[in-house]
């Protein structure tokens, strides 16, 4: 850049608009996210040598690589991922997919990523902090194309009544469907959810697939203090944690295929405890799956014996912000399917579909009234909900007990797959800057600095940025912002540097000019910007 002899200090920053996820509160509770897979999926451990390069934790360096010949896609399992400061970890597949981890959402979690297409995945750390590290433990793969890979989940709420006849019939449906996973939407064993009731009513029927079941509690389960019977049955007598989560909380999450499922507890007080909301937001922030479902007992909206419960709106607020897809509930003893809605119960194309399936076996409650979003309902058929899930959407079927004829069928596309990711703006200050002069001297008092003593020398201001925090994102625009504190005349051109340099060794002759990026005329003090052209995007 040629500068006039007037004094012109300029400081530089780089602003880039990128596609990425907005930051949410980090997860603090250590937990392992269970991954259940499709029938056509295989799993292999990652050898210590390839995962860790012979060290306990992988640090910055060359990319690790996980490969499986013939695979259509892979999921990478992390035993540990800890990111400090602005460090990031980038996964890039041979099929062209990319997944970027940044922030502290995954600290103290072990988890499995969403699928990445291709036979190989490169894991590249961009670490500058000593505390950042990662450790792999396994990977899943399939020779079946991703759009053909499906998994089945089934369940219901309000299940085993005192007679047991109806829940025997709905449990037979689950056995016939043969799902990968089963959910319950609460009130699993009547009347009070005691361990005796679970053992005598639930265990002989729905207990046949207990090993596949991820439950949630209802108000009848809490008729026994602390839902002791519920937790003793699913976790084991006296065990604090287990398949039903920590008995002091009753909420947890798990993954199946390319779906993230969240089991929530609507019985944590008259209103949902803030601790559960904070946990939910952190859990959703750490989720890498393209599709999300949540299930709990009380509905936001109902047209049966109840009209809905405002206490669950904080759940909906968090789920809607995270682009969740399905909410599965019970409490009203009937079947109701709603169109996609926002937390204010208004129709929304990016909303969540609520399916109320309180048809597991308890005596029916009648449907009462209507709602613009109520798409299907029935109050006389015991049955279960069957969900066939893919990486982009779902198919739902209400399956009736033998001898009944009512059915329902619906489909949907996952919100994250049907919309654009949010735009994030990053501002990166220059990490190196120095002015070099054609006479051989240098000055780094500012990015560009000229005064009357330069004697007609030609000056070049060198600037560099660390853009690792933008790794893996899609760049939609970028500009260099210059802060002018003393205006000058003339036009100053911005080029790519033609050689590597440091502030200590930079020289006018040692750094040639590359492609021209743009120009600025600093004729006024304050901010001046140069939009990057194609020459400035290859970074």
UniProtKB/Swiss-Prot annotation:
Sorted UniProt keywords: Hydrolase, Secreted, Signal
Give me the segments passing through the membrane: none
Modified after translation how?
Answer: The C-terminal Pro-sequence may be required for translocation of the phosphatase across the outer membrane.
Q: Which SUPFAM superfamilies match?
A: Metallo-dependent phosphatases
Q: Which Pfam families would you find in this protein's record?
A: Metallophos
InterPro entries given in the database record: Calcineurin-like_PHP_ApaH (IPR004843), Metallo-depent_PP-like (IPR029052), PPA-like (IPR039331)
Q: Which Enzyme Commission numbers does its entry carry?
A: 3.1.3.1
| Residue numbers covered by the propeptide annotation in the UniProt entry | 30-148, 430-539
Q: Which GO terms describe its cellular component?
A: extracellular region
This protein's name: Alkaline phosphatase
Q: Which organism is it from?
A: Lysobacter enzymogenes
The gene name on file is phoA
């Amino acid at each position: 850049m040629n500068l006039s002899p007037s004094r012109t200090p300029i400081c530089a920053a780089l602003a880039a608009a990128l596609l990425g996820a907005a930051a949410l509160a980090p997860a603090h509770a250590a937990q392992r996210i269970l991954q259940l897979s499709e029938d056509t999926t295989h799993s292999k451990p990652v050898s210590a040598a390839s995962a860790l390069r012979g060290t306990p934790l992988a640090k910055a360096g060359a990319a690790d690589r996980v490969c499986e010949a013939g695979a259509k896609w892979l999921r990478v399992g992390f035993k540990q991922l800890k990111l400090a400061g602005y460090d990031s970890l980038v996964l890039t597949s041979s099929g062209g997919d990319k997944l970027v981890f940044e922030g502290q959402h995954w600290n103290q979690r072990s988890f499995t990523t969403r699928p990445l297409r291709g036979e190989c995945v490169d894991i590249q750390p961009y670490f500058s902090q000593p505390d950042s590290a990662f450790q792999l433990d396994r990977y899943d793969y399939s020779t079946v194309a991703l759009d053909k890979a499906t998994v089945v989940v089934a369940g219901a709420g309000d299940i085993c009544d005192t007679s047991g006849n109806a829940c025997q019939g709905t449990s037979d449906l689950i056995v016939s469907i043969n799902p990968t996973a089963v959910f319950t939407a609460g009130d699993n064993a009547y009347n009070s959810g005691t361990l005796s009731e679970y053992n005598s009513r639930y265990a002989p029927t729905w207990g046949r697939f207990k090993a596949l079941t991820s439950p949630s509690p209802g108000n009848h389960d809490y008729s026994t203090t602390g839902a002791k019977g519920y937790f003793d049955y699913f976790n084991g007598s006296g065990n604090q944690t287990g398949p039903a989560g920590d008995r002091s909380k009753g909420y947890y999450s798990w993954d199946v295929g390319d779906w993230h499922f969240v089991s929530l507890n609507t019985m944590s007080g008259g209103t949902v405890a803030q601790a559960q909301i904070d946990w939910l937001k952190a859990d959703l922030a750490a989720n890498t799956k393209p599709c999300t479902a949540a299930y709990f007992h009380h509905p936001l909206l109902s047209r049966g014996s109840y009209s809905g419960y405002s206490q669950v709106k904080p759940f909906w607020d968090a789920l809607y912000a995270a682009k969740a897809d399905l909410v599965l509930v019970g409490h009203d003893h009937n079947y109701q399917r709603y169109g996609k809605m926002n937390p204010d119960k208004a129709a929304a194309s990016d909303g969540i579909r609520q399916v109320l399936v309180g048809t597991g076996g308890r005596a029916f409650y009648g449907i009462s009234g209507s709602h613009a979003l109520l798409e299907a309902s029935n109050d006389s058929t015991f049955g279960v909900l069957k969900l066939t899930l893919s990486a982009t959407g779902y198919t739902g079927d209400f399956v009736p007990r033998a001898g009944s004829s009512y059915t329902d069928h619906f489909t949907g596309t996952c919100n994250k797959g049907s919309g654009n990711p949010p735009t994030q703006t990053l501002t990166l200050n220059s990490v190196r800057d120095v002015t070099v002069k054609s006479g051989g001297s240098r000055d780094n008092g500012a990015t560009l600095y000229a005064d009357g003593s330069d004697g007609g020398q030609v000056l070049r201001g060198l600037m560099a940025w660390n853009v690792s925090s933008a790794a893996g994102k899609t760049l939609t625009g970028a500009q260099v912002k210059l802060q002018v504190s003393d205006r000058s005349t003339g036009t100053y051109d911005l080029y790519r540097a033609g050689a590597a340099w440091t502030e200590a060794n930079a020289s006018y002759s040692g750094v040639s000019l590359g492609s021209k990026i743009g120009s600025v005329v600093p004729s006024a003090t304050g901010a001046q910007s140069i939009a990057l052209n194609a020459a400035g995007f290859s970074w």
